[in-house]
A protein has these predicted regions:
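Small/aliphatic-rich secondary-structure junction motif
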Residues: 1-53, 160-210, 230-232, 237-238, ...
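Structural beta-alpha unit
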Residues: 1, 14, 72-105, 112, ...
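Short, flexible helix-coil linker/hinge segments at the edges of structured domains or between repeats
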Residues: 77, 142-162
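Short beta-strand elements of ligand-binding domains
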Residues: 108-109, 135-140, 292-295
């Protein structure tokens, strides 16, 4: 794996927002940015992973799009190393393969759409379930000011601190180590707090209230799981909560004030068909913050 951030673009507002977010992420990580456009170059077709159909005026559209994006990002982010490349072939396959060479792959997302209610198109959906590296989905409008806290005047920007990184953590689970490493690293790079949310199910007949014994075990498990990571990242302020029931709606709600939301995602053993848990699916539909899906087996 090379140390780079890769962003896939298609000319949509969502992918342009993803390119800006990816540039800022590359600067945070002190690595180059690689901009890619995936799909066959055809004279009259449609953008391969756009959330809505976008007409292609000619087979040079990909080259023009990549050039314009590279120039625009270089102007806004001087000092950032930027390269661009067209990836031929089936978009989901090409993007998933490209992700193997990156620290993170960034794609645009739509949020809760008016028509379909889906966050992203079929290709991005496939990439999230297939990519072997973390994939970040970014909504249009998720600019730098939305990632940062407002000052006393209600203004946010480069001079104000990042919002918390929010981690949806499933315990016990094989995904814990991978998502914890990604989330703590993201919080440390942003000098931000980390808010960890663990969802658990009480017994159907249990009446759970404050201080009830049923809540002790999940809380203790969460505390013990976080202990070595707190020691490894002493500068990250951590808050943790065990939420009864599915945490999807709660995570989507707290994403309003988050700079990044981190989830685990299981890699599919088969190359076809989506594989995504209900919590991840709900969060991806509703989150206002960029969502990082960290793969695990």
């Amino acid at each position: 794996m090379s140390r780079t951030v890769i962003v896939g673009i298609d000319g949509s507002p969502e992918s342009l927002a993803a390119a800006e977010w990816a540039a800022r992420e590359a600067l945070l990580r002190a690595v180059p940015l690689h901009v890619v456009h995936a799909g066959e170059q055809q004279p009259h077709a449609y953008a391969p992973f756009a959330t809505e159909a976008v007409a292609l005026p000619g087979e040079d559209r990909s080259a023009r799009m990549l050039h314009d994006t590279e120039v625009s990002l270089a102007y806004r982010h001087p000092g950032l190393g930027i390269t661009a490349e067209h990836l031929a072939g089936q978009p989901a396959t090409a993007l998933s393969a490209a992700a193997r060479e990156a620290e993170v792959l960034v794609l645009g997302s739509r949020g809760l759409g008016r028509a379909s209610g889906r966050l992203f198109g079929s290709v991005a959906f496939a990439v999230v379930g297939r990519a072997e590296r973390p994939v970040v989905l970014v909504r249009a409008g998720a600019g730098d000011t939305y990632e940062r806290r407002a000052d006393t005047r209600g203004i946010s920007g480069e001079a104000t601190p990042f919002g918390d990184v929010v981690l949806g953590l499933r315990l016990p689970g094989r995904s814990a180590e991978a998502v914890l490493a990604f989330a703590f690293d993201a919080a440390a790079r942003r000098d931000a707090g980390l808010r960890v949310v663990h969802g658990w199910n009480a017994m159907p007949s249990a009446r759970v209230g404050e201080g009830d014994a049923e809540a002790v075990e999940p809380a203790e498990l969460l505390t013990e799981t976080l202990r070595p990571w707190r020691e490894k990242f002493p500068g990250v302020e951590v808050t943790a909560e065990a939420v009864i029931g599915g945490p999807g709606a709660h995570l989507a709600d707290v994403s309003r004030d988050a700079s990044l939301l981190v989830l685990g995602g299981r890699l599919r053993s088969r190359p076809v068909g989506p594989h995504m848990g209900p919590v991840t699916h709900e969060v991806l539909q509703r989150s206002l913050a960029p969502v990082a899906v960290v793969p695990h087996r």
